[in-house]
């Protein structure tokens, strides 16, 4: 390469870098954001504070987030509250959302639902979906007698594509909750939107409705399977558990114990109690997996600990067969309290009365 060409390349790079430097945001906020992304929270906080003092509301909000989460500093909810309040007063919707959250949970201040409502409402007007949803939660679960307000704000959150808001409305219309008139048609519409927005619970609900022909829908296995598969892919334990049951029983699909086991394992790991118990059964029978009573006991125990009465019943039976009467009584008692009649009967026999 000739010296002349090299000189041209070097000059070109110099001017390119100069151009990029001119394009780089070197405002207080820009410097703060780059520092924050790189994990230099101390520098980020310093520049967010400068931005905030300059009247840039986003800088105030980001300071609130840093103090609320203890990023590069100790958690300080009072300072977070102060910065969120400043941001919210400047119509920063994220600042209002953060402020509402602290009042809602009573962090850095006394819990105050009215203050939370005021902050969330301002953010909701500024089109912050989660704030609208949180207003729905407050009116639904925390301040009783406001079902109409809850529906209004769940609807607003759904309109802003907040999947969970759509799902909650689906449940309300399917079950007739929140004082709405029960409507299968509306329930399905809301579930469909929530599922399109990747809400696993909504996809699972649709799968169950199509599988059983409920809510005025025709039974359609193929559609049900697709929705359950999507639910499972979105880490919904119920969707995975339902697929496991289909393959275990050969319902609508070719019976495949190995696939059933895999889905049950996936569901169990996500917290499905009944799926853990079903894995216990498969280990006890050597179905799709080598027979292993230790693993059977462990999985029945997982299911029982998570509240599956069948898992408790099976676990107690294993302890009884192992001549461990004390544990058998304790677990039958738990199964009985969970509502399993046979566990109550066995408990009575073991206690001798």
Predicted features along the sequence, with ranges:
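Hydrophobic face of amphipathic alpha-helices that form TPR/SEL1-like repeat modules
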Residues: 28-35, 62-69, 98-105, 134-141, ...
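N-terminal leader/linker segments that initiate helical-solenoid repeat arrays
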Residues: 17-42, 46-47
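Terminal, low-structured helical/coil segments at or just beyond the last alpha-helical repeat
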Residues: 334-353
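Structural motif corresponding to the intra-repeat A-B loop/turn of tetratricopeptide repeats
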Residues: 38, 74, 110, 142-144, ...
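Short helix-capping/linker turns of helical repeat alpha-solenoids
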Residues: 35-36, 53-56, 69-71, 89-92, ...
């Amino acid at each position: 390469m000739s010296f002349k060409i090299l000189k041209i390349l070097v000059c070109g790079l110099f001017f390119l870098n100069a151009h990029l430097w001119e394009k780089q945001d070197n405002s207080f906020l820009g410097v703060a954001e780059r520092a924050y992304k790189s994990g230099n929270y101390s520098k980020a906080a310093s520049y967010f504070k400068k931005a905030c003092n300059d009247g840039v509301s986003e800088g105030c909000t980001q300071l609130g987030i840093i103090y609320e989460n203890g990023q590069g500093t100790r958690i300080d909810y009072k300072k977070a509250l102060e910065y969120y309040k400043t941001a919210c007063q400047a119509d920063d919707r994220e600042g209002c959302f953060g402020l509402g959250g602290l009042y809602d949970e009573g962090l850095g201040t006394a819990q105050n639902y009215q203050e939370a409502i005021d902050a969330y409402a301002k953010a909701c007007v500024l089109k912050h979906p989660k704030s609208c949803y949180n207003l729905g939660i407050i009116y639904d679960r925390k301040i009783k007698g406001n079902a109409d307000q809850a529906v209004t704000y769940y609807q607003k959150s759904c309109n802003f594509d907040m999947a969970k808001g759509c799902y909650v409305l689906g449940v309300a219309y399917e079950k007739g909750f929140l004082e709405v008139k029960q409507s299968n048609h509306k329930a399905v519409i809301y579930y469909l939107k929530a599922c399109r927005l990747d809400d696993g619970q909504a996809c699972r609900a649709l799968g169950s409705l199509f599988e059983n022909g409920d809510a005025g829908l025709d039974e359609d296995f193929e559609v049900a399977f697709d929705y359950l598969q999507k639910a499972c892919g979105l880490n919904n334990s119920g969707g995975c558990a339902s697929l496991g049951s289909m393959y275990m029983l050969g319902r609508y699909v070719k019976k495949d114990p190995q696939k059933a086991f895999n889905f049950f394992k996936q569901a169990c790991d996500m917290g499905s109690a009944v799926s853990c118990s079903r894995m216990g059964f498969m280990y006890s029978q050597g179905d799709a997996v080598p027979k292993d009573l230790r693993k059977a006991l462990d999985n029945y125990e997982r299911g029982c600990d998570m509240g599956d009465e069948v898992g408790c019943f099976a676990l107690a039976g294993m302890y009884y067969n192992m001549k461990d009467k004390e544990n058998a009584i304790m677990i039958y008692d738990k199964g009985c309290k969970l509502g399993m009649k046979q566990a109550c009967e066995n408990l009575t026999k073991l206690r001798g009365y």
